[in-house]
């Protein structure tokens, strides 16, 4: 089983600022969220055989808190958050109009200049998911620690029939989805009881 998690809260999350490639650490609430996720997995007898993470510290630390020293964390740039370019660090209350239009109606509003496109996000996350599929199909549990938009990119790749439904869905800090595998193919991702805030 694959479990994909969004990192714990950072100060930029708390302040409602766009946080893409900036390398901000978890705040106290984020550390507590990751500890709660660790308990969630421990209570269900989940022991991770492989752990992948975005190289950004908030994702790595989330994974580290969850697995401790029981597994090596493999970082992969394809798990990075969307590159917001010149919009990095801007307020989401409210966001710039062009950013709001993009996130509310990405079909008719392409990514603002300098910002990574959703197609690019889905492409790199899809490439990553296909690369780990053979090993994942052998069994065992895998943890992927990443970011909200990157996580949505993976979920969109795995469920193309969703019609973009995941883009408008809120994914909270340390929210977890599980992805099963059958006959060498991914199953539809499912929400778990580990809901983010």
Each model region followed by its residue ranges:
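Generic beta-sheet signal
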Residues: 2, 140-149
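Glycine-rich phosphate-binding loop signature in dinucleotide/nucleotide-binding domains
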Residues: 44-47, 132-141
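Domain-level recognition of soluble alpha/beta enzyme cores
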Residues: 162-188
């Amino acid at each position: 089983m694959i479990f994909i998690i969004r990192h714990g809260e950072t100060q930029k999350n708390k302040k409602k600022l766009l946080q893409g490639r900036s390398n901000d650490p978890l705040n106290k609430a984020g550390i507590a969220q990751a500890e709660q996720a660790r308990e969630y997995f421990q209570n269900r007898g989940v022991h991770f055989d492989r752990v992948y993470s975005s190289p950004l510290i908030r994702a790595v630390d989330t994974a580290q808190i969850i697995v401790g020293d029981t597994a090596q964390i493999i970082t992969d740039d394809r798990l990075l958050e969307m590159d917001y370019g010149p919009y990095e660090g801007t307020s989401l209350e409210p966001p710039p109009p062009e950013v709001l239009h993009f996130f509310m109606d990405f079909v008719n509003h392409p990514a603002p200049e300098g910002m990574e496109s959703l197609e690019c996000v889905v492409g790199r996350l899809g490439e990553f998911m296909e690369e780990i599929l053979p090993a994942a199909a052998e069994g065992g549990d895998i943890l992927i620690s990443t970011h909200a938009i990157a996580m949505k990119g993976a979920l969109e790749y795995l469920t193309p029939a969703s019609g973009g439904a995941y883009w408008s869905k809120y994914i909270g800090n340390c929210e977890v989805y599980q992805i099963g595998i059958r006959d060498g193919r991914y199953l539809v991702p499912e929400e778990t009881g580990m809901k983010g805030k």
